[in-house]
Structure formats: C-alpha cells, structure tokens
Amino acid sequence: GIGRRQRQMCIRDSLSSFYFDIRKDVLYCDSINSKKRKNCVIVLNIILESLLKWFAPILVFTTEEIYSLVNKSNSESIHENNFVKIPAQWKNEKLNEKWSNLFKIKQEANIAIEEKRANKEIGSSLEAEIKLILKKDKFELLDKLDLADYFIVSKAEKELSKNDDIKIEVKKAQGQKCERCWKILEKKCERCSKVLQ
C-alpha cells in the first residue's frame, strides 16, 4: 500500500541512491577526525535508530539483534524505547524546497554523466569533470556545497548563465587517479596524503 511505497521511496530513493552515495567518499577517505565525517556518522546513527524503531514491530528479532550491537542507552530492548525525537527546527520548508531543487540539478547532471558512460567516454562518474552553467537562482543554490562530492565526480565548477536555465558539460577528468579515493586530480591528492601521514 501507500506506507510500503513511502518506505521504498525514503530508503531506496532518498537514502540509498542519494545520501549514502554522496557520503561514501567522506566515510571511507576523510580522516577519522574530520568534522564532515563526524557529522555524517551522527546522521547515520540517527537514521539507524529511526529505522530500527520503525521496523521493530515487523522484524522483531532482527532489530533486537542489531540494537544490542549499537545500543548506547541503558534500555535492554528496542521495544522498550520511544521513537527518536526529531527536533522541530528540522522541519524547514525553505530548506526542503532548496534540497528538492538541488536534487533536480543532480538528476540532470547524472543524465549527462550517464550519456558519457554509455558512449564509453568515461567509466565511473569519478572519471568525469563537470561544468554547470546555471541561471542565478540555481547558481546560488550550489554556493555552500562541495560540488565534486555532491555530483560524485573528480572536478566540478559552476558558471553563471545568461541564457540557459541549466546546461551541464561533462568531459573526462585530466590528471592522475588517486589510488585511495579514486579521484582523478591534476596534483597529488592532498586529503589522502594527509590522512596517510
């Protein structure tokens, strides 16, 4: 029914193909002390706690077993806990609209990247370099994002458009592939070098 479709949309579309995908690099390659990585771990813990509680009535023993491994409270059973309290300030319609628009830009970029992959010009998206040519409203949406991480490419830049609402140019990234993070960079990968020291 509707509940099943909503769960699938949440887990498959929002988490698996979006959040988990763009955060893999941070989790695997950033320093264990990196603020970005620590914030990501906090979010993943909130997601895990919420999903465990959500599935507890259906997957009684499985959720109990997982809970016993990750339990940080004094409660012996997940079934004795309340649902995770989500702060009221997290319900933010402006932020929701912003991310909805960002998601649409990402979908457009994914289509452009997939065309290059289908034509065998690149293998994975990390072999790509993208340029986003956007009108002012969309251009400003990307201001505080690490574009290469968000689009899962080796290099990303944006340019203000005078005509097109959105235009995305994709080409093969130039440089050497970092053996650790797999990004193709013109210089030695500073992040990975620092982490390995």
Predicted feature locations:
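Single conserved hydrophobic/aromatic residue that forms the stacking wall/gate
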Residues: 1-11
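Short, low-complexity export/processing leader segments characterized by acidic and small residues
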Residues: 11-13, 81
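Short functional micro-motifs and their immediate structural scaffolds
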Residues: 183-186, 197
